Structure formats: C-alpha cells, structure tokens
Amino acid sequence: MKLNLRGHEDRYAIEQSLLAFFPEERPVYEGEDGDSHADVTLHEGNAYATGVTTLTYGGKTARGEARVRIAGVSDAYERERLRQRALKLSFFRAARDVTGVTPSWGALTGIRPAKLVRTMLEDGMTPAQADRVLRDTYCVSPARRRLALESAEAGLKARSDLRPEDISLYIGIPFCPTRCAYCSFVSASVEKSFKLMEPYLAALTAEVEAAGRMVKETGLRIKSFYMGGGTPTTLSASQMDALLTAVNRNFDLSDCVEYCIEAGRPDTIDREKLQVLLDHGADRISVNPQSLEPRVLSAIGRKHSPEDIEKAMELATSMGFPHVNMDLIAGLPADTPEGFRRTLDTCLTFGADNITVHTLSLKKGSRILLEGLPIPSAEDVAAMLDYADPALREKGFAPYYLYRQKYMSGSFENVGWCISGAEGLYNIYIMEELHSILSLGAGGSTKMVDAKRNRIERVFHPKFPLEYIQRPEKLTENLEAFRRFHQEMAR
C-alpha cells in the first residue's frame, strides 16, 4: 500500500497499523498512488495533536480522524507517544470503516498491551476505568480487555516485591537438535555446530565469571535466573553441570526467587540432565511440545513423537520439579482447530501448572516463509485461541503475562497461563519491563531499566556462536555499559 505521510515521519507507527488490517500489504513510500493508498497527516497545535487518515482500499475510501491533548506535556518522549496515538487512531478508524473489520486488539499495535494497562492503574485509574479506555478509545474486544487487565494486575503484584537493586539474569544456549520450521532465532543445530559447543561454553563461563564480579561490585541482587535458547538441554549432563556450577559459584543467588531452565524439546530430556538441574537449585522447567499432532510435528521439523512428550512430562513431574511449563503454538502448519483442541486437552492432563499459548509469528528467515508452507487461516487461529481461554480457566488457570509480536497470525497474542501462585516471575519482569535483564551468551539482548526515570537502554551481544567466541571485547564493553547504567541509576 502506498503511504503518503504529511507533517510527520512516523513510519513505524503507521506500518504497525497497516499490518493489523492488511497483513498481505507492504508499505510503499515512492511512486504513484495505486489502487490502495493512504494519506496520513499530523496537525500539531498548542493544545492538541490531530491525526487525519484518508484511506482507499478495494474500491472504497474512508476518512478517520483522532485528536489527542498534548497541552502541558513537556517530556519529548511522552509528546511523541501522544502524537503516534493520534496517527494510529486515525488510521484505525479509516481502515475499520473501509474493511468493516475491527481487530481483536482494536487500535492497539504495541507488543505490551498489559504494560499500557498497568500504567493506567499506577496512575490512579480503577480496573473499570481502564477497561472503559480500552473499550471506548482503543476498541479492544471484551476477551482481550480481560486478558490485558488480568495480566496488568499480575504485573503490579510482581512489581510490589521488587527493590531498586533487583535484576534478573538470562543465559542463552544457542544450540538445538534441529531447526524448527517456524524459528528464526539465532540457534545452530548440534549436528552442524558440535565443534563449537566446547569453545562456546568456555567463552560463556568466562563471561559468567566477569559478570558475577560486576554484579557484586555494583551491589545488584539477582531476583530471577532463566536459561533459554535454543535448547539448553542439548548440552550433556556434564556440560550442564559445569555451567551451572559456574553460575552458582559466581553469582549470589540467595535472594533469587526463581531458577528456571528451558528444557524445551522432549527428545533432549533425560533423568540424568533433570537431576543436574535439581541439584543446582532449579525449581522451574519448561517442556515445549508446541503440538501433539504427529502431522504437525512432522511439518515443523520435530523428530520426536507425542509419546516422547508424555514420557518427558511424566519424568519431570515424578522427579519433583515444583513448577513445569508447557509451550503450545496456535497456527502451526498442518494444524486445525480440532487438532489444537486435542493437544491442549491432553496437555491439561499432564500436571503442568503453567501453559503458555503462543500464536504463530511469521518470522523472516523461517522455513515457513522461505518455503511458503501453508498455515491455518486467521479464522482458524481465532477458533484455537477462543477454545483455549475457557478451557484453561475451567481447569483453574489464569493469564499472568502476555505480549504480541510483529507478523503474528491474525494479529493475536501470546499468553502465559498458570495455576494461582505458580506465576513465572521472569516472564513478568521482562515483558512488563519492571527491572533490568542481564543477558549472557550469543544473541543476548541486555535490557537496562530505570523505572523511576522511565529510562530503558539496550546492548546486544554478537549473534552467532563463532562471533561470540571471537569477540570477548564486545562482551566486556556490554558489561561495562550495564555497570555504568546502574551506577548512574543509584545516584
């Protein structure tokens, strides 16, 4: 779709609105107007920012307008956020009138809808008032308003237990047995990169030691620890033991309330590895089947069977892990609403106290996009999610965190569900941006959060294992950035 921006250059904001209504369209800024185009104009006065969109699509034209008060707002970040709100609301109203469709999340396009609601509640709104804003201003559906409000309240509860010196620690293991069709994460299959494993672990251990010194010297406190990937359990039991020994030796985890390892794929899980995790203090693991349908597992490149998943869950629960999560994905190739329903119903019998329901995100570089694999329609994905919500609630689960992603099927969401008291705190901390996340390992993204000053900064590690091994100076640079940020924050 040809986009003509006038009075602003907020391409990203408009592109996200475009994606919500027209996922097959791509933004174009050069050339003549075609059959589909939009003029998006910003008028900014002393008191108000007004967005006006005139949109033509499918032979229809509609005009949308939105006005947002900016008088008295001096903070540059906040003024820009309000300007973008006016633009996005104007585009939403025009697109809704042209298509006759209102997306489930209405005019909201950000990846953290619960954070928006949490901010409303922190600013003094009641849940009922926040609900009205979601309904009247953003046109969010009742089901999504409920998800956002419940997740926001979980975020408020998690935040109440935090101290200024609290951070979380993340360690990435960028190896998998094979690469799934939906995946674009920077992870290498073990069969292709086995020779890098030992040098990678040596480099990671050195970084753990340096990071441990920095955290101690800066007076920070580890609140939660999460090891993800990739698939951490591609490591052997002895490799895992050595790495976790280094973690426990170099970090003071006496205040750590959550020690989570993403066990991931059932074909990498065995008793010896799980015992290593328990011995080092892990109280939470994640077993991620994604689906229990054999044809879906085959379509996404998983070599394990549904029976392997059942055995892995039996093993994990019998060994006494306090918390076990299972990840499912709605919208995978070859899946159907009936197949997803069977998967969820079966997973609910396995004893997990956390179930995370993801919506397929169409990521650049994934085999789904590269090979054009057929996927379920947005209507079928909606049917899957519409089944999951009441089915999980009936079994005592409630939503506690959610986020959205770009190019997500049907413009839906990912939701973490749990039994009361089993919330995965790391998930809340990172998605609600409640405190800093120190990320170690290849592909790591360290997020530094100063909630008091509404300041967030990021530094990124080298993406690939070999690059990570060869660039220790970049790791040192990132640790020093983290140190400086928190020293400034403490002043």
Question: Model-flagged regions — what are they?
Answer:
Residues E310-H323, L332-L466:
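A structural motif corresponding to the C-terminal lobe/cap of the Radical SAM core domain
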Residues G51-T54, I171, V287:
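Short beta-strand motif preference
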Residues T99-T102, E122-L169:
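N-terminal [4Fe-4S]-dependent radical SAM core
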Residues D166, C256, E433:
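Conserved catalytic motifs of the protein kinase core domain
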Residues D166-L201:
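Canonical Radical SAM [4Fe-4S] cluster-binding loop centered on the CxxxCxxC motif
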Residues M1-T126, D136, L204, S420-R491:
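Radical SAM enzyme core and accessory elements
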Residues L220-G229, G410-N414, E477-R491:
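Amphipathic, soluble alpha/beta structural segments
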Residues S187-Y387:
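Conserved non-cysteine loop/helix-boundary elements of the Radical SAM core domain that shape
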